[in-house]
Amino acid sequence: MASLIYRQLLTNSYTVELSDEIQEIGSTKTQNVTVNPGPFAQTNYASVNWGPGETNDSTTVEPVLDGPYQPTTFNPPVSYWMLLAPTNAGVVDQGTNNTNRWLATILIKPNVQQVERTYTLFGQQVQVTVSNDSQTKWKFVDLSKQTQDGNYSQHGPLLSTPKLYGVMKHGGKIYTYNGETPNATTGYYSTTNFDTVNMTAYCDFYIIPLAQEAKCTEYINNGLPPIQNTRNIVPVSIVSRNIVYTRAQPNQDIVVSKTSLWKEMQYNRDIVIRFKFANSIIKSGGLGYKWSEVSFKPANYQYTYTRDGEEVTAHTTCSVNGINDFNYNGGSLPTDFVISKYEVIKENSFVYIDYWDDSQAFRNMVYVRSLAADLNSVMCTGGDYSFAIPVGNYPVMTGGAVSLHSAGVTLSTQFTDFVSLNSLRFRFRLSVEEPPFSILRTRVSGLYGLPAAKPNNSQEYYEIAGRFSLISLVPSNDDYQTPIINSVTVRQDLERQLGELRDEFNNLSQQIAMSQLIDLALLPLDMFSMFSGIKSTIDAAKSMATNVMKRFKKSSLANSVSTLTDSLSDAASSISRSASVRSVSSTASAWTEVSNITSDINVTTSSISTQTSTISRRLRLKEMATQTDGMNFDDISAAVLKTKIDKSTQLNTNTLPEIVTEASEKFIPNRAYRVIKDDEVLEASTDGKYFAYKVETILKRFHSMYKFADLVTDSPVISAIIDFKTLKNLNDNYGISRQQALNLLRSDPRVLREFINQDNPIIRNRIESLIMQCRL
C-alpha cells in the first residue's frame, strides 16, 4: 500500500540527531553585519588590545584598581573615593570650598608623645599639638575650620596599620574614615558647594567609585593585596585618566579588503567554551572483582549562551592526547580487586576542544589567516567513583586535579552523523594541581593527575571564557557561501517558495484521475519510488530522502508515536497497580483517551474538536500498526502526494521535506474510523460521536464509548473511506447486497474500483471529496 512511505519515514526519522538542529540554525539565523573599517582599511589590522574578553570580573579576572596617580591638585569627581597611600608622616591631603570649610588630614607616626609641630596648611604655617599613644598603628587626624582666620580643631582620628586613608565628596558632605583598623567606619563633614571643592593630595592615590565602597573599606582595614591588578603600572598624572581608550568590540565584523568577487572579513568574537569529559568503564568477566579498562573518550556538548545581547548556539567536542596508562593489581585470587588499565592525564598530556557556533564567523571558515585566541585557564577536579564489588567495602577512586592553559588554536572539522562542521580547535596544556588522587582501601595514594573514573566531578560542564580573532576570505556577495558544503537556504526565501508550492499543489487536486489514484494507492510506495518522479539525479534523490527524514522527525505524526508510547507505558503501570474497572478502562483507552474524557467531563477545558482530533490521531496510529488488506486514508494521501510530486514544477531539495511533512499532517483532516465485530459495525465519526449499526440494516444507533475502546484494543481499525452517510445514501438510492456493504465497510480497493468504473456518482463524490481534502 502507498502508506508504506509514512511507515518508512517514521522508522528512519529517529536516526537524525544534530544535523537537523544545525540545518535549522543555519536557515533561521543568517544575519550579517558589516562594520565601517575606518582608518584601518589600508593597514589590515585594528589596534586591538586582546584580553580575556568581556566577562564577569568575579569569575575570570580580578577587579581593576584605578590608579596609582601622582600627587596633584584637582577637583575629584563626586561620589568617588580618593584612596590615599602616604609613605611618610606629615600632611596627607587638604581641600576647601573657600567659603565655610577648610579640611586637611595629617599622619602621625606610632608612639609619639604629646608634642607641638608645625604644618603648612593652605599656604600658612600652623602650630598643632599632636600625639599617638599606639605602639604599632599610624594615626590619621582631620584638621578642620569654618572660617579663613579661624582656629583648627581636630577630628577623627583613624588608627591604621595599613597606612591608607579615604576622602570622598558626596551628597553635600565630605566623607572620611575614622575609628581603628580593622574596624574602621566612615564619617562626614557638612559643606556647601561641595562639588567645587578642590583637593590637594601630597601622596600617591587611587580612585574608587561609591558602588565599590565595600572594596575601599576592605583596603582601608586590611591594606592593598601584595599584587593588585591596577590600571597603571607606575604612578601617572591624573590627566591621563581623561584619555579615551579605543577597544575592539566583543563582536565585530570588519571588512579588511574587498574586490568584485571576494572580500577579507576580520571576525572578532567573545566566546564561552563549555565542555565535558566522557569516559568508558568496562568490567571484566568473572566474579565481579576485576575491571579491564577505565578510559577517556571524546565528548560532544551543545549549549546556548548570550553574547553581546544575542543568543548563540554552540557545539564543542572534547578529546585528550598524551594519556598515561596506570594499573592496579590487588592479587592473583579471583576475589582480588584488579584494574587492568586506567587512564590519567598529567602535565605531559593535552586537551583538545573543538568549538563551533552559529555566528557568521563560522559560516565561511574555509580560507583563514591571522588566527589568534586568548582564553582563561580552568581547573578540572576529579570526583569519587566507587567500584561496586560483590562483597566488602567498595574501593573508591577519588581526587586528582589538573588545570588547563591555552596553548594555541588551529582550524579543525567536527564530524557528526550527517554533516561536518568547520570549527576551531583550541589546544590546552596541562599542569597538575592539588589534591592528588588515590584509590581508597588500596595501596594507591598520593598520585598526581586527573583519572578517567569521574573527571567531571558531578558537574554538567566546565567553562572557559575568552575571545578569538581571524581573517577569512569570503564571497563579496553576502548571499553566496564559500563552496565547501551544501549551501544554506535563507528562511524567508524558503517560505516564499513553500507558499508558491502549496498553491500549485492545491490546484493540482482537480487534475487527478480517480481510477489511476486507486491503482497508485495500492502500490507499495517507498522513499525512492516516491521521489523518483523528481527531475533530478539519483544522488539528489538520495539527498532529498535524507532531508525528508530529518524534517519528518519533528512532524506531529512522529510526535504522536512518542506520545502513544508514553500512554501505553502509563496504562501498563496502571494495570500493575490496580485491577479495578477504572484501571482496565484506562488501559483500553490508550488509543482513544475515552476514560480521560469521561472522568474529566465536568472540568475539561478542551473543545470537542480537540478531543476528536486526538482520538483520530490515536486511531490512525493503531491502523498503521495493524495493516489490513483494505485501503486507508494514508494510502489515498500518499497516492495524491505522489501524483502531485510528479506533476509539480517547483519542487527542490529544500521545499520537498516541508511539503511531505505537511502532507502527512494536513491531508484529509476529517477522518472516521470503524471496528467490525461479527455483523455489527462500531464507528467513531468526525464530529466526536460513537455509534453502531448492523451490516444488514445500516440503521444507526448509539453505543457505549467503553465498548468501542475495548474493541479497538483487540480488533483492527479500518479507515472509513466510505463513511456511514455515504453507505446509507448508496443503499437507499441503489440498493447494495450484504457482501457489497461488507466489502465497502472494509475499504476493499477492488470493490471501490468497480463502483468508480461504473461511474457511480455517490462513490465518485466521496472519493473526490477526499482528494479535495488533500490540501496544504
UniProtKB/Swiss-Prot annotation:
The keyword Electron transport does not apply. One of its GO terms (biological process) is virion attachment to host cell. Residues 65-224 are annotated as: Spike head. Disulfide bonds join C203-C216, C318-C380. Residues 484-518 form a coiled coil. Residues 389-409 are annotated as: Hydrophobic. The record marks R231, N232, R241, N242, R247, A248 as: Cleavage. HAMAP family: Rota_A_VP4, Rota_VP4. This is Outer capsid protein VP4. It comes from Rotavirus A (strain RVA/Cow/Canada/C486/1977/G6P6[1]) (RV-A).
